[in-house]
From Swiss-Prot:
This is Cytidylate kinase. Keywords: ATP-binding, Cytoplasm, Kinase, Nucleotide-binding, Transferase. Its main location: cytoplasm. Pfam families: Cytidylate_kin. Its EC number is 2.7.4.25. Belongs to the cytidylate kinase family. Type 1 subfamily. GO terms for molecular function: ATP binding; CMP kinase activity; dCMP kinase activity. GO terms for biological process: nucleobase-containing small molecule interconversion; pyrimidine nucleotide metabolic process. The keyword Nucleotide-binding applies. It is an enzyme of class 2 (transferase). The gene is cmk. The keyword Phosphoprotein does not apply. NCBIfam families: cmk. It is found in: Cytoplasm.
Length: 225
């Protein structure tokens, strides 16, 4: 970790566009990228592979330390390797997201992952995408953004994403899952989902990706040539 490296945190609920916006901005700035949600999902997948119950906090903490995660760029896409296995597709499943949300509510797991996330802070800079990047992991970040969108729009985006992949899912079920996850994330006692006091709030409902990226880039220094 390099404490001198500038950090942009992009927080928000599932489906607000954090991942897409963060990857584009990181690429344009030439900065490192941290997908904190993928770390929690990776632990969830590893725990599932090892048949660890989500109520077994000590086993989950051990799993957190034992799980090796790599982000590998393939063109415009980002693949996530978990213990040497490409788990990208499994990480995107709604069931994995629900599992990650449950695991994220365990204080011991969050504590174990805190330093691992901070280790991504290196020069020339870092774009950190998550739910508590600006409030807990990088409270001293120079640039903070909180993205949001209506639950209906986020469900619509996810529904289209899954449909494009040939995955059949009921929209109403998807909407209920997103709303339930929002409630869990906002009500948990440890690091609840909320914008940092000094974050710039951007509602992405009805706004295109290019416009959101432009708003975020306006907050940052001019990228190095």
């Amino acid at each position: 970790m390099n404490p001198l490296a500038p950090v942009l945190t992009i927080d928000g609920p599932s489906g607000a566009g954090k991942g897409t916006i963060s990857r584009i901005v990181a690429r344009r700035m030439g900065w490192h990228y941290l997908d904190s949600g993928a770390l929690y999902r990776a632990v969830g997948v590893a725990a599932s592979w090892a048949d660890i119950d989500t109520s077994d906090a000590s086993a989950l903490v051990r799993c957190t330390f034992d799980t090796h995660v790599q982000f590998v760029e393939q063109g415009e896409a980002m693949r996530v390797m978990v213990n040497g296995t490409d788990a990208t597709d499994e990480l995107r499943l709604e069931t994995t997201g629900a599992l990650a949300s449950a695991i994220a509510a365990i204080p011991e797991v969050r504590a174990a992952l805190k330093e691992r996330q901070r280790a991504f802070r290196e020069l020339p800079g870092l774009v950190a995408d998550g739910r508590d990047m600006g409030t807990v992991i990088f409270p001293d970040a120079s640039y903070k953004v909180f993205l949001t969108a209506s639950a209906e729009e986020r469900a619509e985006r996810r529904h289209k994403q899954l449909k494009d992949k040939g995955v059949s899912v009921n929209f109403d079920d998807l909407l209920r899952e997103i709303m339930a996850r929002d409630a869990r994330d906002a009500q948990r006692t440890v690091a609840p989902l909320k914008p940092a006091d000094d974050a710039v709030l951007i509602d992405t409902t009805g706004i295109g990706i290019d416009d959101v990226v432009a708003r975020v880039m306006d907050l940052l220094p001019v990228p190095a040539a």
